[in-house]
Amino acid sequence: MKNTTWLRWLAILLALGLVAAACSSGNDDDAETADTATAASDDSGDSDADAGTDTDVGLDLDLGSVCPSPLVIQTDWFAEAEHGALYELVGDDYTVDGDNLVVSGSAQLGGQDLGIDIEVRSGGPAIGFAAPRVQMYTDDSIHLGYTTTDQQMTAWDDLPLISVIAPLDINPQIIMWDADVYPDIKSIADVGAAGITVNLFQAGGFPEAFVAQGIWTQDQVDPSYDGGPARFIAEGDLAQQGFASAEPFNYEFVFEEYGKAPAFQLLHDAGWQVYSQSLGVKPADLEELRPCLEKFVPIVQQAIVDSVTNPARSNAIIVDAVETFDSFWAYSAELAAWSVQQQIDLGLVGNGGDGIVGNMDGARIQAIIDAQREAGIELLDGLSAEDTFTNEFIDDSIGF
């Protein structure tokens, strides 16, 4: 487990960019105690995969006449709780391909069969640490894949994807620091004002924007982060990037030499409000997939709600998949349960401002495009938010 964080960050670096963050306020008290995490796991992480409850969700669940089978979705990493909605859709007959890091089976929602098979493919080493969009333009069998707003814009000229639903309303990426060393630091702006070195991977996206906006100075940005915890723990006086849905748990319960949750702020709260891990389709495929998406996107919306309000089923599949993959990535039931609760507490998953789950705000996307241009990041001329997403398939009645 101690090696998994830096390996994940290495994968992100190799996938051509940093995952920029999104919203909700972070603080240094968000990590649960070890006992709480274990108790939550008993309720929502260790249950059998067939623990879901049959429900009548009021949706058209017949995908057999409109969707390809299997419907293939490419993720950006190994199975983890942030991907819960996708694994919620996998039926109890699922199989795990440990060689190719794929979970597949009949598609279901609330115990009801959807009439097709579904295939959830891991990213990272399964696709040579490429971004999902790269794999989608290499392998035509993939129908949808994860994408993140800032990377979506920089890649638009060559590898465009149109986002059709955002399972996460807020990106989990953070900047974190040691609250004992810096008790008066409360925000990313405070980090900048104090002149604290910010240890990142290579510059890209949000660092350029923060420098351009005067939040940080260029000499604060140290792009030498190797993904491991050693320097942050040993030196103590650095700020560092991470994920709110994992790092607080790992630094408190896994990295025993540190033994506490770091303080942090989500990048969203500092103004970098990207959508992370939205599901995108290639523009050339949109019309062909439209009849499928009209039914499938509302089903994903409901799966988001189901996997958060009762995460036992999806967490069990995720943990089973990672164990069966038997790779360098480890993912415990305790972390899965803690992560879901953390996503709830921070608003990483939830409704937008209009009470609808999964839809996207064009103004928020346009603000990222504008910030990228102001920071000197090269984008396709004329690119605007409306080109890159659609809410047309969203069911406005579905939310938490």
List PLM regions with ranges:
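Pocket-lining segment of extracytoplasmic ligand-binding domains
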Residues: 150, 225-230, 235-326
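Bacterial lipoprotein signal-peptidase II cleavage site
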Residues: 24-33, 46
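Bacterial N-terminal signal peptides that target proteins for export
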Residues: 1-10
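Short, glycine-/small- and polar/acidic-enriched structural segments
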Residues: 52, 57-225, 238, 242
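Short, solvent-exposed loop/beta-turn-alpha elements that line the ligand-binding surface or hinge
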Residues: 95-113, 185, 264-272, 287, ...
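Conserved C-terminal helix/tail region of periplasmic/extracytoplasmic solute-binding proteins
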Residues: 58, 362-400
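C-terminal motif of bacterial Sec signal peptides marking the signal peptidase cleavage site
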Residues: 19-22
